[in-house]
């Protein structure tokens, strides 16, 4: 079967990077059954031939109007599809969609008519915000990192920036590679507009957001970047839990030590692009 990836090495590289990351998600135990979702903006790789490809699905509503997505193209994991299968066959377990001129609906154009993720409204709302603000970020990742989800079941970590402070204090790399910390979204029904709106508010100041008792959403320059930030935070959560399992609350780095890391390495306090 002919694929849109044929003779398009740059697009193919992006799709296969997505496949690589989904393999990592499965290996880490973050992607049970069909858990998790991915959406990546691939508009820059769409040539005139791609833009002329007829739809292979009916026009479907997004559920909201997103003015900055007009004519944009996204690779989306399919609803009900497993990350472990996507890792092997990305174009059979995900699809490329085109946003129509009304900015409120989409159609599938390649390779097969795979219905996008059930969290599509949230993912596209984030993509709309990134485009609106001129960000260079292209990818959104939703997954279920075990230790971070576990921490979200404890009220202490849902207050203010308490979870961020604890995670930053576990190892300098967390502060260095997740300098915006982790935002908190109180529990909301999965796939709901309320969840999308709350996530959008937190993503304005964080690259990774915790959905209470559910999972994380991360944005990044590409899907590997979004994965790396989530992975770094989850490592810190694992260190915290290992220390607790030895019978004590870990000391963590002091506020002064963390400030020294921030100052010496000139860590950003806002999204770099």
Model-derived regions: residue spans:
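Glycine-rich flexible loops
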Residues: 1-273
